[in-house]
Amino acid sequence: MHGDVRTDDYYWMNERDHPDVLAYLEAENQYYEHMTAHTRPLQQQLFEEMKARIKEDDESVPFKYNGYWYYTRFEKGKNYPLYCRRNNTMLSPEEIMFDNNEMAIGHSYFKQAGYSVSENNELAAFGTDTVSRRQYTLQVKNLKTGELYPEEIENTTGRAIWAGDNETFFYTRKEPQTLRSNQIYRHRLGTSVTEDVLVYEEFDETFDVGIFKSKSREFIFIGASSTLTSEYRYSRANGPDFNFEIVQERTRGLEYGISHFGDYFYLVTNADGATNFKLVKTPISATTKDNWEEVIPHREDTLLEDIEIFEEFLVVEERREGLNQINIKRWDGTDDYYLDFDSETY
């Protein structure tokens, strides 16, 4: 630029698989091992102290989804989690869907990016990374037989969203160099990955894309977001055409998140100067901004952070004077209260 030519003497290190780069890294590792050899007893001591403070046989709080209780647990002396579930009640026999300790055998690195279970509770899509590059290979497991389907979809975020037919799922691909999530594909179980349909592609390099299903399981949303702007598309989860329609076209500075309940979409948004955000709703049949109806107005002293929708309640996460608050409202208007916690700084 401006006649100033500069040489990057380290550009060759950009090729992570080049023999010279690998040799350099190996030499650096050997140098480190040599220079820190005298600290190995201390390293082991610190490791044991930190491990002693960890509950090795830990278990997550279970959550119920579509008739099953799902949870993650660890076993003492093992490094990786087990993803489990129980049918209808936590007293039912445990089903181990994924044992990452077994799956990690033979790999110097292993990470599973969660899982997504089909509507009939029989299939689970899951992503694994064995390189530590956050480029997950997506696969499908039959939870009844333990069989893995032959499809392997590479360079994904590792998560899939099932349609209602138990055969179709959507997934997100990454741009290979930058790892920006930029493409949404549709796959039909039992078909070649080469036949997958590109549903959406984001060309603006300042935006990432993702896909998720509404809590009601009736809609699938594609979201595109940058630092200051967001945009969503929606389709019925049961298809069959999966034509995604825009909720509200992106406008720089306009942010909104989306949920579904009944005949409406509910949006947490900063529209119309709502710097602390407000809650609006819009009919599913008319989603553009001119149809938005205010549910919770903007408040100068309260930041509206998020909402959670239940069959009988709307739960609102707020922050006032720097403290978190949880407001619970009945849909029928008969109750509206804040949860009382023992400490202000919960």
Language-model regions: role of each:
Residues M1-G3:
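Charged, compositionally biased N-terminal leader segments and the immediate start
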Residues V5-W12, R16-P41, Q45-Y68, T72-I96, ...:
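Peripheral, non-catalytic segments that deliver or gate enzyme domains
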